[in-house]
Amino acid sequence: MADPIFNGDASDTKTAKLTRPVTGTSTAARNTQQSAAFENSASVSASTSTLQSTTSSTPRINHNPSINSLRNTHVGGAGTETGRGISAAQNAALTGASLAFSNAKEGRAKARVVPPVPNKGNVQLGEKGLNGNGGALAAAAKAGAVGHNAGGGGRTRSPSKVSAMDEGTVHGQHILGSEKTGESQTTDGGSINGRLEHQIGHTGLQKRKQRSNGHLLPPFSGSGNSMTEHGANMKSSSAAFMAANLAAKRSRESSPSQSHGTGIGIGGGLGKQGSPLMSRRQSYASSIDSLDRRLDVSSIPPTSNLVGMWEQANRGVKKGGAGGGGESSSDRGNEVVSRQESLRRPASSHAPVPVLKPEGLTRPVSSHVPDVELVKSSATKPAVQPPNTSSQASISDEIKSPGKPAVQPQIVYSHTSELEPKKSAAKASVPLRPSSSQDLISEETKSTSKPAVQQRPVSSYTPGSVTLKPSSKSPAQKPVIHNTRPVSSHGPSPNFSAKPSIQKLSRPVSSHSPPPTKPSAKPSSQSIRPISPRAMESTESLSKSPVQKPSIPPSRHTPADAPALNTQSAKPQVQAPRPLSMHSPILKPADRDEPSLKPPVQPPRHSSTKTPPKSPRPKPPFEPPVSKQSYNNNYDDDDGSSDDSFVSASSQPKPKSPSFRAKIAQQKRSQSTSISSMNVNSLANAIVAGSLASSRASTPSISSGTTRAPAPPPTRRHKNLHIFHSDNSRTPTPPHNNGSAAGVPIMKTTMRKPKTGKELKEEEGEGEKRRAKKHLVKKHPNKHNEGNRKRWRDGITERERKRYEAVWASNKGLFPYTINQDGEMVEVDGAVDTVPGIVVRDIWERSRLGEDVLEEVWGLVEGRGYRSRLVANMKAGGRLEKDEFVVGLWLIDQRLKGRKLPGRVGSSVWGSAGPMGGIKIRS
């Protein structure tokens, strides 16, 4: 929005400066100073014109805020007024439009719903319509006519939409027209009026919801107001109420700033204690309106301060002078509506919008910049605005008074941070470039002769530098403590501890922002980092102190627990700057081009490590000492990466040469390895020599006269092989001579018992006999002695007989009784030494031989063959005696071995199994 700045003279128009696009309902810059005579005459003629307008024409004209009525109003010609003053007719129209709010309440229930008529030719709002004096009178007449139509001639308490809209359009046209001359209007209409339509459309629904609670009181309604009625006119009345607030505030702003008398009093305290949006725009417009005024930038207070704001609104009305009780109540109503409008205000865009102030201050506008609180309390040069003015665009009396604490600061944009421009002879503008996610706040350059130092980008985590020149016109500042609530606390923020004087900062509200760190004056495009709630300072106090020259580049890894140097005492303290070697040091401006001459130094991985050893290489004389926590590369400060994240080691540039520490470690390692290798080799040689000497002492193979040089030490891989493997110089051990008398070596026995000499002789003799017999009888050795060879049928061995007898002994004597032919139980004779046949069958069946084989064995052993028939007649049930049972078991074993059963058991077998079978009789 390009608006010419007026100094109160119609002919003196300064060059148009690009100012900030303003969102919300209050749009244009304020009117300049005007005489009190116009204002008094306006208040007198307002009552008559408005009372006459209430009984005028009956047609109701509804201006729909969503249509181009407001835009048509502001897009009109260059305007008929040039900022010198407002005519009595327009002041009467403004006052009449404000008084017309009380004409529409009583007859609202009776009023017929009239649909809104869009502005399509009914009312011309251009240069021939509501522009100039005739437009203002027409707006007042329409407001009176609508009030008369709704109320039936009675005095109502509800505001009317038409009166409010006409008043708002007249005021918008009047204010824009009063500050525009010539061709400087071309860029005006779209930006402001579009937001007016947008804001009016958005705030209508919210005010309609609030009217039922009774919180929203119409102005000039007295003590009997009741907002409980709901009807079809609620929408129109809410929009009218909003426009009326705008008109009332502008009528108060249009009062002359030099007049010490009483003003109109409509919304007397609204400009200062009203909604945050109107207060912000008021302070912003006042800073543009007067070159000597300084922009009061403060943050939005929390909602808990609403009560204090309302009380200050009442006090501001009383100090306004001519308001009175009715005006105080109207201000409260206007304040509530304005605050609700500001809550529905669309957020500012994320794209930075350059703002060119007259003083050359350029500041990026973003939605994530914390508020910077700049309070003006001048001791040598007073504020341009007198204390009796009704607009109160600067700081309120409560804040300026030294006795009272500043409870309510001037409210500025919640999503932007502004620095107050100071008047300078040379209006040099220093464009600064906003950073990625943390918008920066540029300091003001107030030097008339030398410009600001060109700044270069800083590394990712190095805070932005503060480049301040001592001001030539900076007045004595009295720091004021404010209760500031930051809207955004993103990212680290610099603590301006490099300045000799530090102002008392606001109390920390948000605990999510990282601790502030010291600023780095390494040249950067970021003049000042966004200030966190723990590190906010007044730019005025900073501008007084000269710039302290930095010393060395800062460390990339600044410790997070670096103590913040902001003072939390009750009074502002002047604190000496910290020594730069303790924390992030700063590079001097003279050394900005010198890091290229310095040898690159590899940064340590952790800043908390010890100071690296001194480098033996000569360093330039201008290089300052490096502190403990700032040992870093000099060229690391030139990379501009993200502002709020630590840079990992992988993203840093690779060092061109290894650091001195690495070289020292490598040299030490190489020396230690060489020395240790020599020590190990000599030690190994000594050990091997000792072991060889001890081993050769017992070996007589080497002659004592000859001395040989020690063998070379074995390789490292085979250093232990000499222990297990024989060397060529060693002689083998002689064999042991432990054998027979003949000297023939004898094989060692394993598990066998050593044989006696008799057995050895028998074996030798048998061998000789076998060899001789072989030679004698070469073929068929058993051909002529058939009966002399051993056979298996000859007899039972001793071992087998003992085993079989054991089985007999365990089974004899069973079943000693039997039944005779008469059926009597008869004891069997000899049953004690015999085994019954049933038991024999059971035992023999365990051999799993066939029944025919078992029958054959039974037949061979029972009664010894020939006695079986006789015994069978004598013995009942058949029993086997000891020798019969033993021979039967022996036959079964032979059959199991694969031998055939004989047709007859020989006498030798019976003799070996009898009672005398085991006894050998020698002759």
Curated annotation (Swiss-Prot):
Compositional bias segments (type: Pro residues): 613-624
UniProt-listed InterPro entries: EF-hand-dom_pair, EH_dom
Family annotation (SMART domains): EH
Domain EH: 800-906
SUPFAM superfamilies in the record: EF-hand (SSF47473)
Disordered: region residues: 1-83, 203-232, 247-290, 316-678, 692-789
Record flagged with keyword Lipid metabolism: yes
Superkingdom assignment: Eukaryota
Regions of compositional bias (Gly residues) in chain numbering: 262-272
Gene3D superfamilies for this protein: EF-hand
Residue spans of biased composition, Basic residues class: 770-782
One of the GO biological process terms: lipid metabolic process
Extent of Polar residues compositional bias: 22-40, 59-72, 280-289, 386-395, 448-475, 485-504, 538-548, 667-678
Manganese is among the record's keywords: no
Biased composition, class Low complexity, residue ranges: 41-58, 519-534, 643-659, 692-709
Assigned keywords, A-Z: Lipid metabolism
Functional description taken from the UniProt entry: Positive regulator of phosphatidylinositol 4,5-bisphosphate turnover and negatively regulates signaling through the cell integrity pathway. Involved in rDNA silencing.
Family assignment from sequence similarity: Belongs to the IRS4 family.
Name of protein: Increased rDNA silencing protein 4
Organism of origin: Sclerotinia sclerotiorum (strain ATCC 18683 / 1980 / Ss-1) (White mold)
Gene: irs4
